[in-house]
Swiss-Prot record:
Classification via SMART domains: RRM (SM00360), RRM_1 (SM00361)
Tissue spec. comment: Expression is neural-specific in both embryos and adults. Expressed from neurula stage onwards in primary motor-, inter- and sensory-neurons. Expressed in the closing neural tube and motor neurons of stage 18 embryos, and primarily in the ventricular zone and dorsal region of the tailbud and adult brain. Expressed from stage 26 onwards in the differentiating ganglion cell layer of the retina, extending to the inner nuclear layer at later stages.
Family classification: Belongs to the RRM elav family.
Keywords, alphabetical: Developmental protein, Differentiation, Neurogenesis, Repeat, Ribonucleoprotein, RNA-binding
Note on domains (UniProt): RRM 1 and RRM 2 bind cooperatively to AU-rich sequences in target mRNAs. RRM 3 binds to poly-A mRNA sequences.
Alphabetical list of Gene3D superfamilies matching this protein: 3.30.70.330
Domain of life: Eukaryota
Source organism (scientific name): Xenopus laevis (African clawed frog)
Protein name: ELAV-like protein 3
Pfam family for this entry, one: RRM_1
Length: 348
């Protein structure tokens, strides 16, 4: 049973990220005022509990808790379509920011997908370490309606890393923000900030990113190179503080991405500690965007982490940014290796 604890503001790193686009709608005004998307739902919440919670506000035409097609596990978000637009508005005002178990849910209108609202996500760097999320929003709000925002923080100290994301309602608003703020010094800043699109890279750009990541990894792990002839094992691809195989470098650096799964883009995370659990992956990847699923691979005997896990994110540019930021990241006494899951890993 889901226990309602309290109401509070939605946090950026609340677990699974925020999904806000409703595909397959016709974009009519009535639809846009009755369709809601609900993010950051507890993974053990059932369809019945989801319907009961939002049905307490008003008559529901339909609702759907989104699940993994293979495992049946909740992906942490769902859609609600009310009969009356007033009930949809009331649901946002009443339930947005509600704390359910360890999650704080976000309730908002599910915007129909259209060209005018795509690619409106900005990447901001060199922010003052003292700037918080609200102050960043105030800086950017003069250029348009902000849908989501977040500032990345150090997982240990909680101190800002000086990097943030701002998603505007429309691309043209994001363009104006770039024109107005890129290269400028906000109040309290010691250097100019960089503001640019965090767009989906092209296939060529994606391969270049992979090449860079694996060349960096290859430089980090020195020693003799050997061809890998045995059946692929995630543990053999990047052994901790040992030689990396030339097969994994050449194949992975030049490989075309396998494409998104039904749930999104799958990321391979290696060199986790035996004590690592799913919450560690949520905390690491949640700040970068919409995380739909995390899985730590455990030893059947000890139930301890075997050193690796997988994270699924819905958006390519957010997944790529997470990889670029977390590959080589020191977690405790370990250095993580983070990459897109490849076709070989799919077969493992």
């Amino acid at each position: 049973m889901v226990t309602i604890i309290s109401t509070m503001e939605t946090q950026a790193n609340n677990g699974p990220g925020c999904v806000g686009i409703l595909n397959g709608t016709n974009g009519e005004a009535d639809d846009s005022k009755t369709n809601l998307i609900v993010n950051y739902l507890p993974q053990n919440m059932t369809q019945e509990e989801f319907k009961s919670l939002f049905g307490s506000i008003g008559e529901i035409e339909s609702c759907k808790l989104v699940r993994d097609k293979i495992t049946g596990q909740s992906l942490g978000y769902g859609f609600v379509n009310y009969v009356d637009p007033n009930d949809a508005d009331k649901a946002i005002n009443t339930l947005n920011g509600l704390k359910l178990q360890t999650k704080t849910i976000k309730v908002s209108y599910a915007r129909p997908s259209s060209a005018s609202i795509r690619d409106a996500n900005l990447y901001v760097s060199s922010l003052p370490k003292t700037m918080n999320q609200k102050e960043m929003e105030q800086l950017f709000s003069q250029y348009g309606r902000i849908i989501t925002s977040r500032i990345l923080v150090d997982q240990v100290t909680g101190v800002s890393r000086g990097v943030g994301f701002i998603r505007f309602d429309k691309r043209i608003e994001a363009e104006e923000a770039i024109k107005g703020l890129n290269g400028q010094k906000p109040l309290g800043a010691s250097e100019p900030i960089t503001v640019k699109f965090a767009n989906n890279p092209s296939q060529k750009t994606g391969q270049a990113l992979l090449t860079h990541l694996y060349q960096t990894t290859a430089r980090r792990y020195t020693g003799p190179l050997h061809h890998q002839t045995q059946r692929f094992s995630p543990l053999s691809i990047l052994p901790r503080f040992s030689p990396i195989t030339i097969d994994s470098v050449t194949n992975l650096a030049g490989v075309s991405l396998t494409g998104p799964t039904t749930a999104g883009w799958c990321i391979f995370v290696y060199n986790l500690s035996p004590e690592a659990d799913e919450s560690v992956l949520w905390q690491l990847f949640g700040p970068f965007g919409a995380v739909t699923n995390v899985k730590v691979i455990r030893d059947f005997t000890t139930n301890k982490c075997k050193g690796f896990g997988f994270v699924t994110m819905t958006n390519y540019d957010e997944a790529a940014m997470a990889i670029a930021s977390l590959n080589g990241y020191r977690l405790g006494d370990r250095v993580l290796q983070v990459s897109f899951k490849t076709s070989k890993q799919h077969k493992a």
